[in-house]
């Protein structure tokens, strides 16, 4: 898999997966679900970035839960992927224990969740 690093606005407007760094404001309370492919627990929430709304999906079986609330400002690094008809999704917001992907994170109030 090849990950491209580009400006966030270009990645948001594009169609190919891209590794991104950006800031955003949390819009929704996190919901938790069990990933059918990863077989792990995830948290997901929406956030508004400078380019538009994104869904952040974080694997909390790998990284600690990030206690975000609507209105919080966060910094995010992860892989942005497009889902037709929905806002782009940003995942891999945690370290990769298998060392196959760059490490991502969510930073909230100065604390790193990775």
What residue ranges belong to the model's regions?
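OB-fold and OB-like single-stranded nucleic-acid-recognition modules
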Residues: 1-114
């Amino acid at each position: 898999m090849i990950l491209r690093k580009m400006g966030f606005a270009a990645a948001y407007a594009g169609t190919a997966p891209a590794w991104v760094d950006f800031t955003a404001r949390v819009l929704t309370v996190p919901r938790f679900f069990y990933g059918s492919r990863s077989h792990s627990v995830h948290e997901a929430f929406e956030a508004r970035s400078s380019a538009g709304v994104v869904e952040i999906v974080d694997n909390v079986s790998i990284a600690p839960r990030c206690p975000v609330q609507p209105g919080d400002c966060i910094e995010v690094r992860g892989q942005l992927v497009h889902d037709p008809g929905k806002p782009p999704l940003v995942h891999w917001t945690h370290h990769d224990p298998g060392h196959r992907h760059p490490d991502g994170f969510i930073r909230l109030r100065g604390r790193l969740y990775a």
